[in-house]
């Protein structure tokens, strides 16, 4: 690939498959960033189960237990294997005091030996569309095959301090003040930056981007501007979608 080759960009229509758009591999896929990680994870899980796969959704940080999915924290592999024979989609995590789930007791490696796909929310963003990682973030399993960085297009044109989790870090990466407005260039910069969304991506893992909340013409234009500033030496593909749901 040439240094300035454009990244592959995929516009999602309503009934298109996200799993196909991202070419989700068997094994571990991790979601980082802001603006729709949980929604993405659950949509991918449902699509993969419909294909006949066994899927585990989990976290290395914390998530709320998703509705309608059997949830638990088994301490032995046999328990998980048995549960997957009954229910092809499980959510695994350790119950926390605030009602959320933390990382499960079983390792991600163990889980990936039991299910066809393990989908991991590996970052938190307090429901904000954009995110810059702190020094201990994200928590991406080293065996991860695909990392998907999520950015919410509703952050564009807004003050950094209002739409970015860890806004001071986000502003610093962009060379701006927190009171300045987010541009398409800023979103692209943080997505591709090794201190931004590409932080701690395991060697050999694929790296893709979801530009979420492309709900209207203006946001779709912003998405195209972001994609045009990304090149394929850092990002494999960009998927532009409007997933709805909570971030």
Q: Which positions does each model-derived feature cover?
A:
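General beta-strand structural signal in soluble alpha/beta enzymes
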Residues: 31, 56-59, 91-94, 118-122, ...
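Structural alpha-beta junctions
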Residues: 50-55, 117, 228-241
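N-terminal phosphate/diphosphate-binding loop that engages ATP/GTP or pyrophosphate donors
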Residues: 45-95
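N-terminal amphipathic/basic-hydrophobic helices that include classical n-h-c signal peptides
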Residues: 1-11
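Walker A (P-loop) phosphate-binding motif
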Residues: 14-49
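Conserved catalytic-core segment of NTP-binding enzymes
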Residues: 99-114, 123-233, 245
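Loop/turn-to-beta-strand initiation segments
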Residues: 87-89, 114-118, 146
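Structural motif
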Residues: 33, 60, 94-96, 212-215, ...
């Amino acid at each position: 690939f040439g240094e300035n080759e454009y990244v592959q960009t995929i516009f999602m229509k309503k009934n298109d498959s996200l799993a196909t758009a991202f070419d989700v591999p068997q094994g571990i896929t991790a979601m980082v960033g802001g603006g729709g990680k949980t929604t993405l994870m659950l949509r991918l899980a449902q699509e993969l189960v419909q294909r006949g796969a066994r899927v585990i959704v989990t976290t290395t940080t914390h998530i709320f237990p998703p509705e309608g999915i059997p949830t638990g924290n088994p301490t032995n592999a046999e328990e998980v294997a048995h549960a997957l024979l009954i229910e092809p989609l499980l959510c695994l995590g350790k119950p926390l005091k605030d009602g959320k789930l933390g990382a499960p007791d079983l390792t991600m490696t163990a889980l990936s030996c039991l299910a066809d796909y393990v989908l991991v929310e590996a970052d938190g963003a307090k429901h904000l569309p954009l995110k810059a990682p702190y020094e201990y973030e994200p928590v991406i399993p080293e065996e991860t095959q695909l990392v998907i960085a999520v950015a919410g297009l509703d952050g564009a044109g807004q003050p950094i301090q209002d739409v970015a989790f860890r806004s001071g870090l986000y502003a610093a990466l962009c060379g701006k003040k927190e009171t300045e407005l987010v541009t398409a260039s800023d979103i692209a910069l943080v997505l591709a930056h090794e201190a931004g969304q590409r932080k701690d991506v395991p060697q050999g893992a694929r790296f893709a981007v979801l530009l979420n909340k492309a709900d209207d013409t203006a946001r779709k234009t912003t998405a195209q501007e972001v994609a045009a500033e990304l090149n394929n030496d850092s990002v494999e593909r960009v998927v532009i979608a409007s997933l709805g749901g909570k971030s």
